[in-house]
Amino acid sequence: MALTKSRDYVSVKPATEAVTVEQARLHLDLDDNYYDSQLNQLIIVARQRVEQDSRRSLITQTRVMSMDAFPSDGIIELPTVPVQSVSSITYVDGNDATQTLSSSLYLVDSNNTPSRVVLNDGESWPNNRGHYDDVKVTYIAGYGDTVGDVDEVAKFAMLMLVSHLFNSPSVTSYGTMNIVPIGYELLIESLKWGQYP
């Protein structure tokens, strides 16, 4: 795939988390809700870490992939899975006007990993202005809207991190941020896809 520089970010955060505070409490064997506020924060941190390490979006969220130009081979590979849908593809034309590409020009293949946006036969990407972040693909990613939709391995990896962070506050000190619990990497290996440096 021929791609110019690209980046991907969350534009609309998940409305709910991939594991519940109740699940975290059960995993930690806590009897009351005294630590719920802390657990909520740790759940967010754990989800973000699992998503980063696995290149998967665990719960429904809106993401934006921005590129300097359309790929020369006609295929846009989205950097995270699973992809539910593509909301829009916009670009800045030669007159500095933002245009929305008609969805009739392309097909979204979300059945493969990575998910791809492919031009329909006979179509071509329009010319863009050629500046930084001129092309933006807005898409919905995640296993679904509820905890029950989320992959069980991903949920367990999150709970491992929540437990690790809760029971070892020192892991947030300088030089120890990359320490993860034993077994976490094995779970991530089963989830992640693509080439990693």
Feature-to-residue mapping (PLM):
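Divalent metal-cofactor coordination and adjacent catalytic microenvironments
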Residues: 1-197
